[in-house]
Amino acid sequence: MATLLTTDDLRRALVECAGETDGTDLSGDFLDLRFEDIGYDSLALMETAARLESRYGVSIPDDVAGRVDTPRELLDLINGALAEAA
């Protein structure tokens, strides 16, 4: 079975793609925060999704990736694709 995306891996990818934003702390429980509330725009979200697709060898349509509202939804989307590919 393919390695699942962990919360720590997702946090690293979010920081790599969008950087630390003013006052945004991703060290705590960030999974249910809305992307817009932590300063991530649609471009940063699409870049993060593309990076995770490449890193984990899955394919997520842009229109699907663009509809996620929280990091938890993105985590579930990637891990669902990994489970389907297994």
Curated annotation (Swiss-Prot):
GO terms for molecular function: acyl binding; acyl carrier activity. One of its GO terms (cellular component) is membrane. 4'-phosphopantetheine is transferred from CoA to a specific serine of the apo-ACP-like protein. SUPFAM superfamilies: ACP-like. Residues 4-82 form the Carrier domain. Keywords: Antibiotic biosynthesis, Phosphopantetheine, Phosphoprotein. The modification O-(pantetheine 4'-phosphoryl)serine is found at residue 42. It holds the Pfam family PP-binding. Pathway: Antibiotic biosynthesis; actinorhodin biosynthesis. Disulfide bonds: none annotated. PROSITE patterns: CARRIER, PHOSPHOPANTETHEINE. GO terms for biological process: antibiotic biosynthetic process; lipid A biosynthetic process. Acyl carrier protein. This is Actinorhodin polyketide synthase acyl carrier protein. It comes from Streptomyces coelicolor (strain ATCC BAA-471 / A3(2) / M145). The lineage of its organism: Bacteria, Bacillati, Actinomycetota, Actinomycetes, Kitasatosporales.
